[in-house]
Regions:
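Extracellular/mature segments of secreted proteins
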Residues: 62-67, 91-95, 145-146, 172-175
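Sequence contexts marking disulfide-bonded cysteines in secreted/extracellular proteins
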Residues: 19, 55-57, 83-87, 136-138, ...
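Short, low-complexity, disordered segments immediately C-terminal to signal peptides
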Residues: 7-44
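A short, solvent-exposed beta-edge/loop patch
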Residues: 115-180
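Amphipathic alpha-helical segments
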Residues: 53-72
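Short, solvent-exposed recognition patches
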Residues: 66-126
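Positively charged n-region of N-terminal signal peptides that target proteins for export
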Residues: 1-4
Length: 180
């Protein structure tokens, strides 16, 4: 899945109207000088609550057992987004990706492959190209207007797309209650 990055112009507009943060007090024994660049915390794009979530912690031992995943997840980064990958050798793989900047409406999804649905209290899209029958499926969960969680499943051998969608749906159902 590729995402659009339309939030940048809006972010720049919002930041242009923000005031300058005061500089933190100087540490004892150091001279305090005011630099021309502002010091302080980086600007916050939008608080979604996803920033506090470790994607690998979204599937605990009981969740992994329920999803048929007997391995620990490995943290990774996908296009700047935090993710976790679980690979069950010879069977399938699951990747959960947290996007703190792209809501469901921002994601580029071919309409012919997406089905609107709901997982728990979150709006969702199930994405699978049934004609390709490539053993892959994704469930995208909307978290507010500006964030999303993507659950991707790929079957070993790239076959049985319906099974991949069942697995993605199971993982989405386990992850969803832990989302803001």
């Amino acid at each position: 899945m590729r995402t659009k990055y339309l939030a940048v112009p809006a972010l720049l507009l919002v930041l242009a109207g923000c005031g300058q943060q005061p500089a933190p007090p100087a540490a004892a024994g150091h001279a305090s000088t005011q630099a021309t660049a502002t010091a302080g915390p980086p600007p916050v794009v939008a608080w979604t609550g996803l920033a506090a979530i470790d994607p690998c912690a979204l599937l605990g031992p009981q969740d992994r057992s329920a999803a048929g995943v007997g391995v620990l997840g490995k943290p990774k980064e996908i296009a700047g987004a935090r993710a976790c990958d679980w690979t069950v050798p010879g069977t399938f793989g699951v990747t959960v990706t947290l996007s703190e900047t792209d809501g469901l409406a921002d994601l580029e999804v071919a309409k012919k492959t997406a089905t609107k649905t709901k997982v728990g209290t979150h709006p969702a899209l199930q994405v699978a190209d049934k004609k390709a029958a490539d053993g892959t499926c994704a469930v995208l969960l909307g978290v507010g207007d500006a964030a999303s969680v993507q659950i991707d499943v790929s079957n070993t051998g790239f076959s049985d797309t319906p099974l991949a969608c069942r697995r993605a749906g199971t993982v989405a159902g386990l992850v969803e209650p832990k989302l803001p």
